[in-house]
Amino acid sequence: MLFHQLSSTFKDLNYESRYSLDSFPVPMCENIRIRRNRLTKKVFDKEDYRGVIVSKKRYFFGVRVQVITTVDNLPVEFAVLPGSCSDLQGLAELALDFAEGSEIAADAAYTEYNWEDYLLEEDKINLLVARKKNSKRVDLPAMKDYKAWLGHRIETTIGEVEKFFPKKIHATTLNGFILKIALFLWAFQLDKAFIQ
């Protein structure tokens, strides 16, 4: 796909090798309309697509998009998963094709020490996860601020990507819905790289 070819070019041009990782939900319909929606009738296991937005204390029916962006807010990798998937499951689905020594900042939902150690040992990628208060691995204050700075960048990007999406994505099949999400991300990537 052209998105991935452009992404590899952007990764090569990103000399800082600093990235941010986060996910955002894309609802197919409101919860109240699940039984009447034509698209949801074609989804076999509906519970896989029922997710929760913890920050808003709200459930949704749709997909969750995992996105990795550069410091300049260019998306370079993404994965579209059912809404019930956790952030760690999304991390497992990403290709993580980055240069050695790359740093990927993520929020506390990606806390998994085995993943951090594996990526550092095998791929030489440093996964910078924001630590919870009860974490076994404690960060220095400077590292905590650095992770927060990198993490806030992706929140801005996700807001900009969601502005690209229409209020409702019209699709008749699940594959068409996912294709439209991928095309919106590609359009955002082109807009961010060449127009803005």
How should these model regions be labeled?
Residues 1-196:
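Short alpha-helical elements
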